[in-house]
Design a protein with these regions (language model features):
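SDR active-site strand-loop-helix element
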Residues: 1, 32-37, 84-86
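NAD(P)H-binding glycine-rich loop region in Rossmannoid oxidoreductase-like domains
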Residues: 1-19, 23-26, 130
Length: 140
């Protein structure tokens, strides 16, 4: 599992993911669950104007571009990957009640999810191939 973060900074996610992929290949490990963010690729359509133009457009643009590069590395890795795209992290308890795999046309998500629920979903996907080579969004 890969859940690397660096706040607003760029470069950390892609570089860390590159190292994880290399280590997995060297060890013969094939299953990778990688946490990215809602808004990458086709999930851009799930975002509201605040996230599209203010947050990812201005304030955390380097982090956004880092996620784009990270996802490219995962897709090209040759591993059995799933890229999880959670909405904005919030503090909160594990609820086990969240939406996942919604289409890019869904515009009724809350655009937030607890870290505990993100971890729950990622752990479940280690043994579930429903989202193998897919990029499910994750939100309340």
């Amino acid at each position: 599992m890969c859940s690397i973060g660096a706040g607003r900074k760029g470069g950390v996610r892609a570089e860390g993911t590159r190292n994880i992929i290399a280590a997995m290949k060297a060890a013969g490990v094939s299953r990778l669950i990688c946490q990215s963010t809602l808004g990458i690729g086709e999930s851009w359509k799930n975002l509201n104007a605040f996230w599209k133009y203010l947050m990812f457009g201005l304030f955390i643009r380097p982090a956004y571009l880092d996620h784009v590069e990270q996802e490219k590395l995962v897709r090209e890795s040759g591993l059995d990957w799933s890229i999880v795209r959670p909405a904005a992290f919030i503090d909160g308890e594990l609820t086990g009640h969240y939406r996942h795999g919604f289409p890019a046309t869904a515009n009724d998500t809350k655009l937030e999810i607890s870290r505990a629920d993100v971890a729950d979903f990622m752990l479940k996907n280690l043994v579930d191939n429903t989202y193998l080579h897919k990029t499910p969004g994750l939100s309340y």
